[in-house]
């Protein structure tokens, strides 16, 4: 069999094998067999030395034409196989649109976040600004600027989380107030601010205590700010959060950064002030601490206490949420039980 006959036979055989290939792998095997470096066409070219000189050009031309034909059919066959594979995958992954859908569970706000957002809107409406500050604080701002001397019990290692000798996890958001007082320009008006955020204390976690909790503190500094201004503000807060029929009272207390200092109670939600287990038969429930800003605190911030005065208050957002929603265990706030959070969906905006 001469080379021309061999080329004719190879043409028919090769095209048939290309057509019969059922996968990209088998098609590639055919390609290697026909046009690879050691394939059939290459073997024919190696036999050119045995061809008469006058026919070598014609044989070479036939080989090139056949190689082009094979490559063209190989490319077309590969495209067809890819298309079939895509169609098969689409068929296998086809979605039955008549099947019922899966319900998406919509998230809800955390109860503490609900309380915080509500109070922020309330105070912003009264002209307050919301100010944030660092959670890792220096002793200077966390204690000294707030009239807490070196020997104060709150500065003890057993009560506070120290990061190093001079820095700690803030034990209240009051340092934000100290930083803000230092920078405030009273020529532009009184300072009215709230500072919400996380605070940290060395408490053993139980149903009513947590080593980390949420606090919101408020501060007003200006000329002729009085205890009656504080009383009126706190009454508005209590009625806003706990109901317009809620009665309030102020009791004398002690805080190093205020003088005089008071604690505010509200009439019991359960018994209306008659006395029950919730209010320990007193008819009242403690909700926050407050007072007139101590002159030493004003002086530390560079404010003349003979010209300016102010009031401050601090409330636990966790405690407000516990009281408002009747939650028994503070640890529920920090659990990962979605069912607990879903109870408060109706309380959202």
From Swiss-Prot:
One term of GO molecular function: catalytic activity, acting on a protein
Entry-linked SUPFAM superfamilies: Class II aaRS and biotin synthetases (SSF55681), tRNA-binding arm (SSF46589)
GO CC terms in record: cytoplasm
Domain of life: Bacteria
Keywords: Aminoacyl-tRNA synthetase, ATP-binding, Cytoplasm, Ligase, Magnesium, Metal-binding, Nucleotide-binding, Protein biosynthesis
Entry annotated with the keyword Cytoplasm: yes
InterPro entries attached to this UniProt entry: aa-tRNA-synth_II, aa-tRNA-synth_II/BPL/LPL, Phe-tRNA-synth_IIc_asu, Phe-tRNA_ligase_II_N, Phe_tRNA_ligase_alpha1_bac, Phenylalanyl-tRNA_Synthase, tRNA-bd_arm
Localization annotation: Cytoplasm
Assigned protein family: Belongs to the class-II aminoacyl-tRNA synthetase family. Phe-tRNA synthetase alpha subunit type 1 subfamily.
Record's protein name: Phenylalanine--tRNA ligase alpha subunit
Species: Lactobacillus delbrueckii subsp. bulgaricus (strain ATCC 11842 / DSM 20081 / BCRC 10696 / JCM 1002 / NBRC 13953 / NCIMB 11778 / NCTC 12712 / WDCM 00102 / Lb 14)
The organism's taxonomic lineage, starting at the top: Bacteria, Bacillati, Bacillota, Bacilli, Lactobacillales
